[in-house]
Every structure is written in structure tokens, then in C-alpha cells.
Amino acid sequence: MLLKIDGRPVDAQCGESLLYLVRKLGLDSADLRTRPLAANVAGETFTLNYVPVREQEGKSVPRAMLRRAVRAANGEVSLLRYDSARGNRVYERTMLFVFLLAMRKLYPKTRVRINYAVGAGLYASVGDNMRLTEPEVLAVKREMRRIVEADLTLERKRVDVDDAIDFFSCDGQEDKVRLLRWRQFSYFDVYRQEDYVDYFYGEMAPSTGYANVFDLQALPTGLFLIRPSAKDPNVPAKHVYMPHLAGVFSESEEWGRLMHCTVV
């Protein structure tokens, strides 16, 4: 079936992913400035692992059909890159997954919390204000680089809400347990790699290999995960620690804790 990806026509066969079609058109790139990270289909963000044409179920003779979003878009697909707001968020989620997976492998019993985004990246607290040494931070960066080079496929899995509650409860992630108890649907979407399971609101890049530009710095009370530069996404942004601004965020979190509303 005929699709148009960034205005270029391509014949999509049943079972072929958007990533396959992007590469077929020669639109993939190692340069983060031009590399497609996800796709916009009818106003929604989709992973490039999305398969736009599949067999119609319930038919005695299988028939290929366009999926709902692609039909609504009349076969038009536009690619999201780092220079777009949605593409930027896709990259950030993917980078964050790599970071959390690395921390889980190196510190399996330690809880890591992403506290807030500020400036060029994300501030994370480790355990009970655990402070990592420079050699320990370098070890985390090496593990992140190993995960990136492994190019692990990132696929979302749908699980039963009760099963997700049981898992996160056993894993000590009580924030997610409290949120899930209010969920009105019986299912829950997670990303899984080996024994690490987590929830992210929104799509990711097709694999961990896409998050190859990052940096990690030790702070007095945690870690700072740095995104690619807006001017040149192929290098990490420069981050200057601002203790007064960090103090404002810390005070805000403390008020949230006192008011019992740390999770929204």
C-alpha cells in the first residue's frame, strides 16, 4: 500500500515497520540533526517500530489493511527529529531509559528518582541523597555507553494493571503503585529490558543506539543527566550548576512531601 513519508512515496508491505521504510527511502542518518527519531501520524506520535500495514483479523482470507491512524492521515507520515519539541522529548525518554537501566545494573537495590528538568538536562537523586564519586559516575557512563552500543530494541508491552501493581510493589516503586490504583483502564503499557521494567509517558526511539549523545555529572546531592546541545545535537550541552535555582526546586519538593503530594 502506498504511503508518503516526508512527502516521498513508498510502497509499504504487510509487516514492514516505519523504520524499515525510512531506511528504504534513504532517510536515516547517523547525524542527530537529521536523524528521524519517531513519526507524526494524524497528529499522534508513533515509534518508528510501528507497523502501518497489517493483516485484517477475523477474515477467512487474510487481507492487508492500513491501521487506524494511517488511514486517518490518508497515508501521510511526517518524521520527527531532534529539532522538534516532540522529537526532543522522544530522545530525552530514550536517554533516560538508558540511564535508569545502567543504574539498575550497577545499583540494583538503590532507587533512582528523576526530580526535575532544568537547563540542559535532568536532575536525579540516588537513594537517600547518596553521593556518587567521580569513579562511580564514570562507571555509570561506561555502562550507559555499553547499553547504547548494544542497540537494544525498545518495544512497549501491554500488561494487566493488577500485574503491574504487583510488580512495582515488589520492586519498591510505591509511587507507581499509588498512581496505578487510580488508573481507569485494565491495562498498562511498560518498556522491558531483561529484568528491568518501567513506565514512560510517550514514545521512544526504536532502540537504545539512538541515545548516543549524553553526559553525566555528579552534583552535591545527586546526578545531572545532560541532553544534546540545541545548537549541535551531536555533542552534549554545556551545563553550569546553579545552586540557588536547585535550592528553589528542592524547597518545592519539600513542600510537596509535607503536603503528601510528591507524585502527580
Role assignments for model-derived ranges:
Residues 1-10:
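Eukaryote-biased recognition of intrinsically disordered, low-complexity regulatory segments
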Residues 8, 16, 169-170:
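Extended beta-strand solenoid/passenger and fiber regions
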Residues 15-29:
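Short amphipathic, charge-patterned alpha-helical segments
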Residues 17, 107, 212-213:
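Residue-level detector of alpha-helical segments with a strong bias toward transmembrane helices
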Residues 17-21, 94, 98, 139-143:
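Long, highly charged amphipathic alpha-helices
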Residues 22, 88-106:
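Active/ligand-binding-proximal structured segments within catalytic/core domains
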Residues 27-31, 106-110:
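Short helix-capping/linker segments at secondary-structure and domain boundaries
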Residues 33-42, 48-91, 102, 111-264:
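Auxiliary tRNA-acceptor-end handling modules of aminoacyl-tRNA synthetases
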